[in-house]
Amino acid sequence: MLMPKRVKYRKQQRGRIKGNATRGNTLTYGEYGLQALEPGWITATQIEAARVAMTRFIKRGGKVWIKIFPDKPVTKKPAETRMGSGKGSPEFWVAVVKPGRVLFEIAGVSEEVAKEALRLAMHKLPIKTKFLKREELGGEDNEG
């Protein structure tokens, strides 16, 4: 399971997710990717479930990159506890995702295989996503 080795503060406030992703919104490593279309929290368990679904489908071919990391702790109070007496203890970790963020990338497989692998991963995630394909000629990726 993904989580930070150590953090400066054990507990964080929830915060708001405003605007679109300005970083991590293009394909960096792979040929195909999965891009978030709406904001949300993705837990470490969901990331792992999506990764397992993809790697099982593509078997030994290809490589998968996980482009998000769960670095935000989410606290929870025990069941049947009265209100008050402080904030609960950290229960799990989430990655905060803005629309436009690339979540996963795949390379070394055909487009059909990549599409199906990312479709399987899509079903494990709590947000709407879309399939991305690297444009070889033209587009924003060519700089220079």
Swiss-Prot record:
Protein name as annotated: Large ribosomal subunit protein uL16
Cysteine pairings via disulfide bonds: none
Family note: Belongs to the universal ribosomal protein uL16 family.
UniProt lineage: Bacteria, Bacillati, Bacillota, Clostridia, Thermoanaerobacterales
UniProt function note: Binds 23S rRNA and is also seen to make contacts with the A and possibly P site tRNAs.
Molecular function terms, GO-annotated: rRNA binding; structural constituent of ribosome; tRNA binding
Keywords: Ribonucleoprotein, Ribosomal protein, RNA-binding, rRNA-binding, tRNA-binding
Keyword Ribosomal protein in record: yes
Xref: PANTHER family: 50S/60S RIBOSOMAL PROTEIN L16, LARGE RIBOSOMAL SUBUNIT PROTEIN UL16M
